[in-house]
Amino acid sequence: MLKTRIIPCVLLKNSQLVKSIEFKDFRTIGHLTSTMRIYNARNVDELIILDIDASKSGEIDFESIEDLAKECFMPLTIGGGIKTLEDIQKILNLGADKISINSKALEDMDFISKAGNRFGSQCIVCSIDVKRKGDQFCVYDRGNLLEKSPLELALEYEKKGAGELLLTSVDFEGKAKGYDLELLKIFQNKLKIPLIINGGLSKPSDGVEALNLGADALAGAYIFHFSKYTPKDVKEELARQGFAVRLL
């Protein structure tokens, strides 16, 4: 049985690690090196770092990525500003294990296939940000709501060769009120690739609810920095509920 992964998902901004609320109102988590050492000590399963400066400017902070990778002793996913296969090659050469693509995948779905063919689909994570519009869920990209079904987009990404999907609820992101379960229900039993749910994790029982609705891995930021819970607390609750986790 595959083990459920607990994955801190944090943002890189001005060479600092931060978290946000609804992709705004940023709050500093800490310096790159010290934060990596905390994650190492807490034995998290993986780490996702999204470079939001690069997403806006198109200039990837390779120096910070190198600093992160040197201190990171767990599988590391880097996203933000990736536009070319050469960008991916450089990020992987610096020590990352996977890359996450969002806007580039929307612009050019064939890029997913090209990246998967060159580097292996197992290291290609496609990211979809979702925001509600009334009672509908829409894909959210750089401040714009797209008239595109998140599930349809995810299925297209899967067909193009994505290895995993990172699904983030913008409405729930950073609010610490649990995952968007209505969003998860739309995806339940629809994908063959692993689904990482992100946005809203506030306590271990939130993770149980998400896994019961088909999530394969749990991502979060607030819970691991601004609450009393640690990754171990989440894992222990999952284990009590019968889910396979990596406990040391």
Curated annotation (Swiss-Prot):
Its EC number is 4.3.2.10. The active site is at D129. GO terms for molecular function: imidazoleglycerol-phosphate synthase activity; lyase activity. Gene3D superfamilies: Aldolase class I (3.20.20.70). Transmembrane segments: none annotated. Belongs to the HisA/HisF family. IGPS catalyzes the conversion of PRFAR and glutamine to IGP, AICAR and glutamate. The HisF subunit catalyzes the cyclization activity that produces IGP and AICAR from PRFAR using the ammonia provided by the HisH subunit. PANTHER family: IMIDAZOLE GLYCEROL PHOSPHATE SYNTHASE HISHF (PTHR21235:SF2), IMIDAZOLE GLYCEROL PHOSPHATE SYNTHASE SUBUNIT HISF/H IGP SYNTHASE SUBUNIT HISF/H (PTHR21235). This is Putative imidazole glycerol phosphate synthase subunit hisF2. It comes from Campylobacter jejuni subsp. jejuni serotype O:2 (strain ATCC 700819 / NCTC 11168). The gene is hisF2.
